[in-house]
Every structure is written in C-alpha cells, then in structure tokens.
C-alpha cells in the first residue's frame, strides 16, 4: 500500500509541474507574438535610417567632422568592444549556449593576437557564464528587465558612443540570437562600428534632404546605433521567448508521458495487490 501511496504522490507532483510548464509555455507564446510585431516595425526603421545615411554621405556637400569620422574608421591599437546579449532567466533550452560559446571563441582569438577587449554584458545568465574567466574584460553589466525598456537601450548606446568618442575602442560587435521561429534561433555576430559606408550608384538630389540645424550626421549616427541595439534586443527577446516556449512545451509533453507511465504502473500495482488478495482468499477457503 505504501508503494501505491508513493505513486499517487508522484503523479500528483508531476501533474502540478505540468500545469506550471503549460502556463509558462502560454505566457512565452503571448510575449513572443507581441515582440514579433515590434521586430517588423524595427526592420522598416533600420532600413530607413541606413538608406538615409547612405544617401546623405553620397552627397558631396556633407563632409564628416573629426568627431564623426571616429564612427566610420577603425582606430588602431584600441580595444575590441563586444556586446553580449543573453537571457535574464533560465528554462530556455540552449538559448545562451551558442552565444557564450561564440564569445569565448572570439575572445580566445583576440587574446592570441594580443588585442585589447572590453565586454558589455546584457542578461544575468551571460554575466554568470563569463564573469569568472573574463572578469577583467567586463566594462559594464546590465540586467534585462521583464519588458522591453528604452532606458536600457539608451544606457547601452551611451556606453558605446562614449567609448568611441574617447578613442577607447576600435570596433564594436554585438552578439545576439536572431529569431527565425519558435524552434529556431540563429546565433548572430553583427558589427555595429565602424559604420560601413553604403555605396549606391543611383544619383541623390542634393535638395532631396532638407535639415534645419547642425550636426546632421551626428544625429543620424545616434539614431543608427540606437536602432541597431533596439533591433538586437528585440531579436534576442523574441528568440528567448521562443526557446522558452519550446522548452516548456517539451517539458509539458514529457510530463504527460511520465504521468501515463506512472498511472499504468499504479494500475498494475493495484491489480497485483487485488490478485494477491484473491489468491489468499481462495487459498483460505480451500483450507477450510
């Protein structure tokens, strides 16, 4: 009987866990759907900013100032700035593994070349994975809020802008998971700086863009860096929720399979007990 009690307790426990994983699956699916719509809007914004910068830089009347040139040229003998986007929480499968693996490989390659390294880490899981081995390289760490927060984006952008303006870094690369679908996330290594000068053979009318005030290129650079960070954050968030949704779906299915096996085992145990009792009753009656 004690065995039956243990089986019932275990079935109850697994069912409770199954309810939690199912709820987490539904929450992640809802969050992922919302973020996907934000990604669609950000794609258009990034394309517009890139096109505008390409057009303006192709116009002879716009010349880059010394400060602006820092964002388009590689500054020798300065640090490589690596921005790592991981998750704040776990239970999202291998979401963080591919990112951390690529970052470690790149750090090793840069170390072999004798180059300087700076790390900006976004997300608790990324920080925990890198702090022991690369604590000296970590310049900043940001926790990832539960919802998409523009303040985080602005803080990261300010760190990047300040590092470039103060000639502290030669380039900036961002690591994030790009969302394909709920089951597939693509590890992406994207260069933010120096900004590539787009080449467009089409002639742009000098009068096409009108801008009142100074610092046109500087403002565009701000918008460009901001949009790149925002895009990566959204992609990373969508990928995280997709990975978590898939992981929780698998956990729910596994729980269901386990419940079926435990129920079968329970029924067999009960049947065995009943059979044993019947045999004892029959044996007793025959003895009489």
Swiss-Prot record:
Keyword Cell inner membrane annotated: yes
Membrane topology value: Peripheral membrane protein
Keyword match Transport: yes
InterPro entries (alphabetical): ATP_synth_F1_ATPase_gsu, ATP_synth_F1_gsu
GO BP terms, alphabetized: proton motive force-driven plasma membrane ATP synthesis
Subcellular location: Cell inner membrane
Pfam families: ATP-synt
Keyword vocabulary terms for this entry: ATP synthesis, Cell inner membrane, Cell membrane, CF(1), Hydrogen ion transport, Ion transport, Membrane, Transport
GO CC term, one of those recorded: plasma membrane
Main location: membrane
Molecular function in Gene Ontology: ATP binding; proton-transporting ATP synthase activity, rotational mechanism
Annotated HAMAP family: ATP_synth_gamma_bact
Function (record text): Produces ATP from ADP in the presence of a proton gradient across the membrane. The gamma chain is believed to be important in regulating ATPase activity and the flow of protons through the CF(0) complex.
Family the UniProt entry places it in: Belongs to the ATPase gamma chain family.
Subunit structure as annotated in this protein's UniProt entry: F-type ATPases have 2 components, CF(1) - the catalytic core - and CF(0) - the membrane proton channel. CF(1) has five subunits: alpha(3), beta(3), gamma(1), delta(1), epsilon(1). CF(0) has three main subunits: a, b and c.
Name recorded for this polypeptide: ATP synthase gamma chain
Organism the protein comes from: Rickettsia felis (strain ATCC VR-1525 / URRWXCal2) (Rickettsia azadi)
């Amino acid at each position: 009987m004690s065995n039956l009690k243990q089986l019932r307790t275990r079935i109850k426990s697994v069912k409770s866990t199954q309810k939690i994983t199912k709820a987490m699956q539904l929450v992640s699916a809802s969050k992922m759907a919302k973020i996907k719509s934000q990604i669609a809007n950000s794609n258009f914004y990034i394309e517009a900013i890139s096109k505008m910068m390409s057009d303006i830089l192709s116009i002879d009347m716009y010349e880059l100032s010394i400060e602006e040139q820092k964002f388009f040229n590689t500054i020798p003998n300065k640090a490589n700035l690596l921005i790592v986007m991981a998750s704040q929480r776990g239970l999202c499968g291998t979401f963080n593994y591919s990112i951390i693996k690529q970052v470690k490989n790149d750090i090793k390659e840069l170390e072999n070349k004798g180059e300087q390294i700076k790390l900006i880490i976004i997300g608790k899981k990324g920080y925990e994975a890198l702090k022991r081995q690369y604590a000296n390289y970590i310049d900043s760490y940001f926790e990832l809020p539960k919802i998409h927060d523009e303040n985080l984006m602005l803080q990261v952008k300010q760190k990047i802008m300040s590092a470039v303006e103060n000639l502290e870094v030669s380039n900036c690369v961002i690591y994030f998971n790009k969302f394909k679908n709920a089951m597939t996330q693509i590890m992406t290594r994207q260069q933010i700086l120096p900004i590539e000068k787009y080449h467009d053979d089409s002639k742009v009318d000098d009068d096409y863009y009108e801008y009142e005030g100074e610092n046109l290129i500087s403002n565009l650079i701000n918008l460009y860096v901001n949009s790149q960070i925002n895009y990566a954050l959204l992609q990373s968030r969508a990928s995280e929720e997709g990975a978590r949704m898939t992981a929780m779906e698998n956990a729910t299915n596994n729980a269901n399979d386990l419940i079926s096996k435990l129920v079968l085992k329970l029924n067999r145990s009960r049947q065995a007990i009943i059979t044993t009792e019947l045999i004892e009753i029959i044996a007793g009656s025959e003895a009489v």
